């Protein structure tokens, strides 16, 4: 708790002047990482949604030129931690494809798309999800197929195949980011936690386990809100302890799903 509302602000909002102001993890990713249900320090996290934030939780920043060149950032987290992470492409690619397909009269829902994609064999074409050609909206399927053609491969104009390409590419990108973070920070990761909307995508979670060769724990979906509330609860005396204690509450109160590597994917 950092104080109470200024009287003029409280009056404008119709709130008591005694209303407390709590400093939570004020970036949404900071609150999401606070809610990662990890019970040891040897974890990586992926906040997976429209975009992906992949990294480690550290006590000290990594300030090397190699780290900067690898596009990793050092951002403050809850309780003085450092969120050492790389910003990456995410499920924006798939949502944009769905928007294009819907405009063309293809009405496959996400569960059907993912089931069809999961039935395809591994080892198909991949793209770089971070390529700037994927930032703008509109006609994402064709841009993905063009990127595959540019790499010397072909990708059929089929929703299931394009979906599988996206998920394979994200999982491979996550694995590469985790390997780089381990090397640059001098850490070894035993488990990967996926939080946010992407934690509901079972194909993405399984392929991430396959690509990393590590156990993946998925959930909670609303990690940002959970982390925010937990820090407020601690400030109000309704919860206590450090991040490990708060995370123990998350693990005990949310249905988490674990994925183990079934086959090592190519990177």
What do the predicted segments below correspond to?
Residues 2-3:
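Internal nucleotide-binding/catalytic subdomain
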Residues 10-191, 200-224, 230-266:
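Active-site core segments that coordinate phosphate-bearing ligands/cofactors
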Residues 197:
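Glycine-rich Rossmann-fold phosphate-binding loop(s) that bind the pyrophosphate
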């Amino acid at each position: 708790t950092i104080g109470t509302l200024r009287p003029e602000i409280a009056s404008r909002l119709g709130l008591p002047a005694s209303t407390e102001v709590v400093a939570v993890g004020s970036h949404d990713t900071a609150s999401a990482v606070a809610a990662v249900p990890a019970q040891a320090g040897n974890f990586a996290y992926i906040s997976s949604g429209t975009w992906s934030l992949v990294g480690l939780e550290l006590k000290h920043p990594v300030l090397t030129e190699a780290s900067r060149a690898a596009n990793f950032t050092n951002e403050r987290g809850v309780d003085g931690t450092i969120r050492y992470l790389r910003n990456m492409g995410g499920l924006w690619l798939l949502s944009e494809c769905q928007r294009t397909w819907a405009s063309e009269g293809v009405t496959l829902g996400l569960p059907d798309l993912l089931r069809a994609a999961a039935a395809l064999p591994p080892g198909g074409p991949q793209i770089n999800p971070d390529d700037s050609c994927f930032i703008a909206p509109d006609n994402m399927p064709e841009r993905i197929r063009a990127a595959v053609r540019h790499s010397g491969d072909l990708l059929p104009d089929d929703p299931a195949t394009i979906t599988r390409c996206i998920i394979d590419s994200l999982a491979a990108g996550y694995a590469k980011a985790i390997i780089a973070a381990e090397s640059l920070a001098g850490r070894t990761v035993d488990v990967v936690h996926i939080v946010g909307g992407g934690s509901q995508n079972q194909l993405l979670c399984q392929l991430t386990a396959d690509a990393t060769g590590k156990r993946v724990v998925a959930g909670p979906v609303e990690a940002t809100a959970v982390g925010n509330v937990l820090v407020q609860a601690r400030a109000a005396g309704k919860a206590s302890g450090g991040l490990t204690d708060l995370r123990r509450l998350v693990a005990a109160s949310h249905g988490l799903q674990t994925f183990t590597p079934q086959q090592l994917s190519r990177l």
